[in-house]
């Protein structure tokens, strides 16, 4: 009875992790966190004017789409901080001249 190595599921798990990360980032970025204006039958999420016999709503519209988007202030943006820290870690790890090698073939 020959010994066989267990199946390698690392590629499947890597693809699943990347897919879940993409889905989570899209859901986070596209989520609407602005307050709703209007009542249950008249919503004005993008601004506008509604006039009824007894009711008038004037809403100028949102200034940003969600809580993650705000102006062009890069140091405050979460995605910019992630990219900046990743680049710093990569550059610092490449600059070190010595590599750790255990000396065994794997």
UniProtKB/Swiss-Prot annotation:
Membrane-spanning parts: 10-30, 72-92
Lumenal side: 31-71
InterPro entries, alphabetized: Plant_vir_prot (IPR001896)
Cytoplasmic side: 1-9, 93-106
Function per UniProt: Plays a role in viral cell-to-cell propagation, by facilitating genome transport to neighboring plant cells through plasmosdesmata,.
Extra information: TGBp1, TGBp2 and TGBp3 seem to act together for cell-to-cell propagation. TGBp1 is the main movement protein that physically cross the plasmodesma with the viral genome. TGBp2 and TGBp3 would facilitate TGBp1 function.
Protein name: Movement protein TGB2
Provenance organism: Chrysanthemum virus B
Lineage: Viruses, Riboviria, Orthornavirae, Kitrinoviricota, Alsuviricetes
């Amino acid at each position: 009875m020959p010994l066989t190595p267990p199946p390698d599921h690392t590629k499947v798990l890597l693809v699943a992790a990347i897919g879940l990360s993409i889905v989570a980032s899209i859901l986070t970025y596209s989520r609407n966190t602005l307050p709703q204006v209007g009542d249950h039958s008249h919503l004005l999420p993008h601004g506008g004017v509604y006039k009824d016999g007894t009711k008038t709503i004037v809403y100028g519209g949102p200034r940003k789409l969600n809580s993650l988007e705000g102006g062009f202030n890069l140091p405050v943006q979460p995605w910019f901080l992630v990219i900046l820290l990743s680049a710093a870690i990569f550059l610092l790890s490449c600059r070190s001249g010595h590599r750790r090698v255990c000396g065994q073939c794997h």
